[in-house]
């Protein structure tokens, strides 16, 4: 069940927002604390503005007037707030009313609860924290459930992967109806996974005022993450990194899971502790993971087995689980290689073998590129502005250059320019130079392309960098970084689908 949080300043604007999204939502939460004016009669009638709803039935509405101290927008007299809640609920149009945990302890909400009982409105008993999880969430759920018929609600902002794990465990171990959701980047997965965690409902929003709290719009929830199809048997896949919310991977993998008929979902998880993530992966029974910066190296000690691509490159970008545990590979290697090999087979009779290539850059991204090239018998020259780094990476990868040569030089110097000219069948750019927002930069502005070079830039934002544009203008065939992303993601998708079949069997 998916509820949209409404935070517009007028009742009519909120009704319009709700009606625009009736295709994707099951109900709404009216955040009356965001209203510029709160006339009691109009507030009480608000649910009637949404009739009829989906399937010609009424739209369930939660009435919430959140105090400033709980992360809301209401700063007025507490007695006035409670009277507003009492009178609006007493009209009998709201399906739920949200009341904070402290009100039941003091008994100050007795009149609101009495009005709710008479009108058939269910009470949601809530706890909110923007400063971590606020202690033992399991115990708090028990306290929030103390009054019969009330639905406990926990909305917190986890500040770490460990706190997300605490939230997930609390929801999975709870019994009965509950709403346990996280806010912010660390809490985002709990929004999507609410049905998997056994929650009664989750929240979404299109209003920027609720960006931190609700996190994602209704259409994305339903069309990308297929929220309404998720259940406690759904397989959970993830991409981990820090930061992670910019990742393109959910938009790539989720449609492919749907096309394959998989009861699976792929979510971004912000990870500050790899150890905590693997505890979370065990709790959620995660069969496959995409790994991005800064965790490609730090995940390796947690894996049962790694293949040569991980050993050579020193980084793992894909994890899958089998009967014996998690295994790691690096699909960046073949993801980079596939579009290049396709072009090479059409240009040269022997394909890549025996060609001469220059790799610009000696950072982490270059290692997968260098390893892929020398594995295919390409003679490689590594150029970097810090010469010692170019030398180090070539020495580390030289044991894998079984049928190829591997040399190095200083980028921008005469010697380096000479090496570049002698290794110009293929030129691969692996640095961040030219990446958004630095789009006017070029890693080798002094080099004059001749038109015979096959030029590859692994940067995919922008799709065509200044480096690639200059090469294309000189008649060179170019390969965009987006092709590498697509290639490695496709390989990941195959591995994830295999892991899903193994899990299902």
Task: Please state what every model-predicted region is.
Residues 234-348:
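Phosphate/diphosphate ligand-binding glycine-rich loop within oxidoreductases
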Residues 102-233:
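Catalytic alpha/beta core domains of metabolic enzymes, predominantly
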Residues 402-478, 483:
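Rossmann-like adenosine-cofactor binding region
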Residues 378-400:
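NAD(P)-binding Rossmann-fold cofactor-contacting core
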Residues 338, 342, 460-461, 476-503:
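Active-site capping/gating segments
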Residues 2-118, 122-134:
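Active-site beta->alpha loop and helix N-cap motifs at the rims of alpha/beta catalytic domains
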